[in-house]
């Protein structure tokens, strides 16, 4: 079964996203967004070239993206579903099918300013 590895930058992104979600929308909203992120990461690990994922070679070689909106239904839980997720997972398929999660960025950001230059 494929696995994923989260970069330090992506880990910091997740912490920031969940902190902001908690502060602005409360604990249940944070829990919903956390479940959504986990569902998206697992979906990417299971099927890296899944429907909804995009080749992003224009940003960096081998880079792919997947918007959290595509994992909304899989992340549905007791407290509901995230209605309008706004983040994109940027990742690469590495050796041995290990998925490298590079960043999680807001979809309104100029992503090229926040991605590693490789």
Descriptions of predicted regions:
Residues 75-118:
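Enriched for short, Lys/Arg-rich terminal
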Residues 3-75:
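Basic, Lys/Arg-enriched alpha-helical interface segments
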């Amino acid at each position: 079964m494929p696995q994923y590895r989260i970069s330090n930058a992506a880990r910091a992104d997740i912490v920031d996203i969940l902190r902001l979600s908690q502060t602005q929308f409360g604990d249940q909203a944070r829990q919903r967004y956390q479940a959504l992120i986990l569902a998206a990461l697992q979906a990417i690990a299971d099927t890296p070239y899944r429907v909804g994922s995009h080749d992003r070679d224009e940003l960096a070689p081998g880079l792919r993206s997947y918007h959290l909106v595509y994992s909304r239904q899989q992340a549905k839980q007791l407290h509901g579903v995230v209605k309008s997720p706004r983040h994109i997972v940027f990742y690469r398929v590495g050796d041995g099918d290990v998925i490298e999660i590079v960043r999680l960025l807001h979809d309104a950001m100029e992503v090229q300013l926040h991605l590693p230059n490789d």
